[in-house]
Amino acid sequence: MNQEIFERVKKVVIDQLEVPEDSVVPEASFANDLNADSLDTVELVMALEEEFDIEIPDEEAEKIDTVGKAVEHISEKVEATA
């Protein structure tokens, strides 16, 4: 897992969902562990798109349900544009 991307994702998640830093771990589920509802998730995806200057289509965003999956997906997008 790309540590730099994880740290940036972690910061966005903490800011967007207002959760404690120690709860943002790769296996944390946005809905179950971080109590994000569907609106929170949409706003989180938008914030991640802005932070990383990428676009995440809705069908891909629906599959991103944990912090680790977000990091993995963003890593692939960032590497593809590098």
UniProtKB/Swiss-Prot annotation:
Family matches, as NCBIfam families: acyl_carrier, PRK00982.1-2, PRK00982.1-3, PRK00982.1-4, PRK00982.1-5
Any one GO cellular component localisation term in the record: membrane
Residues bearing PTM O-(pantetheine 4'-phosphoryl)serine: 38
Domain Carrier: start-end pairs: 3-78
Keywords, alphabetical: Cytoplasm, Fatty acid biosynthesis, Fatty acid metabolism, Lipid biosynthesis, Lipid metabolism, Phosphopantetheine, Phosphoprotein
Keyword Lipid biosynthesis: yes
Role this protein plays: Carrier of the growing fatty acid chain in fatty acid biosynthesis.
InterPro entries per record: ACP, ACP-like_sf, PP-bd_ACP, Ppantetheine_attach_site
Gene3D superfamilies referenced in this protein's UniProt entry, alphabetically: ACP-like (1.10.1200.10)
PROSITE patterns: CARRIER, PHOSPHOPANTETHEINE
Chief place where the protein resides: cytoplasm
Descriptive protein name: Acyl carrier protein
Modification after translation: 4'-phosphopantetheine is transferred from CoA to a specific serine of apo-ACP by AcpS. This modification is essential for activity because fatty acids are bound in thioester linkage to the sulfhydryl of the prosthetic group.
PANTHER family: ACYL CARRIER PROTEIN, CARRIER DOMAIN-CONTAINING PROTEIN
Biological process per Gene Ontology, one example term: lipid A biosynthetic process
Name of a matching Pfam family: PP-binding
Pathway recorded for this protein: Lipid metabolism; fatty acid biosynthesis
Protein family (similarity comment): Belongs to the acyl carrier protein (ACP) family.
